[in-house]
């Protein structure tokens, strides 16, 4: 009895596999026939059907074939719009952004124009890499999304654009923070030059990200870097740089009176005063 049951189950599974294989082979054969067909209307209908069923690769292939043929026709609008999405859903975000922008530029009076303009920027956002990689595409995405918000301030897509902008700016902030720390950490190799570079990066960071979660740490490191730079400076520059360290400290304490870096900052302040006293004797 057990063996008979196993045989029935195996036979049923074989039938299912055979049926699936047949359907798959038939579907592939139908798609290949469509690719070779000269009937653009048939291709158009099939492409729309594939798209609506989530078969974006097949939809993309057929749309690519017919877009030059239907250019200027009524069907060109929806075909071009879907074409952008076929790339987006296949995670080819740079191509998607290109075709969404092309759609907006070509069909700027379309009912899909607003969405296409948003998707141009959002596709660039999706292509944005981790913060530790080059952020050129993130900057491009920020420009595109901010441009969308400026054009369509009341759009239903604005909240999603705002969220993407926040994430992109956080990446740029983290990238700038890590870059500043890198220069500071390299001081052990070429102390003076890297300290100067770190101070420039600290200053740039504060200008670009005034409300950053890293602002307090950067302001403290600025004090420390200036003090260390004073230590390794030639005699004629020492006093000036110790005075700058003191100024950085005073500005820091005014802003962060209860900072976790307060004790360290005070120590640098006191050491700077002592060094100036010695230099004045």
Where are these regions (language model features)?
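Bacterial N-terminal signal peptides
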Residues: 16-25
């Amino acid at each position: 009895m057990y063996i008979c049951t196993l045989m029935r189950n195996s036979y049923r599974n074989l039938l299912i596999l055979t049926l699936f294989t047949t359907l798959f082979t038939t579907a592939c054969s139908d798609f290949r026939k469509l690719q070779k067909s000269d009937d653009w209307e048939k291709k158009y209908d099939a492409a729309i059907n594939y798209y609506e069923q989530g078969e974006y690769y097949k939809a993309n292939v057929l749309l690519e074939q017919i877009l030059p043929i239907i250019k200027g026709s009524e069907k060109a609008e929806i075909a071009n719009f879907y074409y952008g999405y076929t790339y987006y859903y296949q995670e080819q975000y740079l191509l998607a952004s290109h075709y969404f922008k092309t759609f907006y530029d070509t069909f700027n009076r379309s009912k899909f124009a607003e969405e296409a303009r948003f998707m141009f920027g959002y596709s660039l956002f999706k292509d944005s890499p981790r913060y530790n990689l080059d952020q050129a595409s993130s900057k491009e995405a920020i420009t595109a999304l901010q441009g969308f918000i400026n054009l369509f301030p009341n759009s239903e897509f604005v909240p999603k654009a705002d969220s993407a902008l926040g994430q992109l700016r956080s990446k740029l902030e983290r990238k700038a923070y890590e870059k500043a720390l890198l220069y500071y950490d390299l001081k052990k190799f070429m102390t003076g030059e890297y300290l100067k570079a770190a101070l420039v990066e600290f200053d740039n960071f504060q200008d670009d990200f005034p409300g950053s979660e890293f602002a307090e740490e950067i302001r403290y490191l600025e004090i420390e870097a200036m003090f260390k730079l004073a230590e390794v400076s030639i005699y004629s520059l020492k006093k000036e740089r110790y005075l700058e360290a003191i100024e950085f400290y005073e500005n820091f304490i005014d802003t962060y009176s209860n900072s976790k870096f307060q004790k360290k900052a005070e120590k640098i302040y006191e050491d700077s005063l002592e060094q100036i006293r010695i230099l004045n004797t």
